[in-house]
């Protein structure tokens, strides 16, 4: 059985979003959400959740290269907890080290410097977070 999964790449100004299916293990970028000091428009997040009806939501966990936590790590955990508390969705965290760099590299290769828009990078990062979550077998399939 395939499950639908939404992924978020949390940031204080922009939150990337992607959707995927466990049967294919691939993700598709969705429009990023603007945030102000890490606070998104919760109504837009709610609409996204209602539109896609995910079985699970994955939030990228920004860790330092040595695996230690940083300020943004705590904010991402808080965002994940709020998703669960507000909407009752199952939320899992996924290590997101190097996803932003990898997303920038992919976008640059496709469209050059002009294609490197922050929201696009964040949503491609969300795709990479979700695909790595699928690769790790986290969906239990």
Curated annotation (Swiss-Prot):
Gene Ontology cellular-component terms listed: cytosol
EC number: 3.1.-.-
Keyword vocabulary terms for this entry: Cytoplasm, Hydrolase, Nuclease, Ribosome biogenesis
Keyword Hydrolase found: yes
Main subcellular location: cytoplasm
Pfam annotation, one family: RuvX
Localization per record: Cytoplasm
SUPFAM superfamilies reported in the protein's UniProt record: Ribonuclease H-like
Superkingdom of this protein's organism: Bacteria
NCBIfam families xrefs: RNAse_H_YqgF (TIGR00250)
Protein name in the entry: Putative pre-16S rRNA nuclease
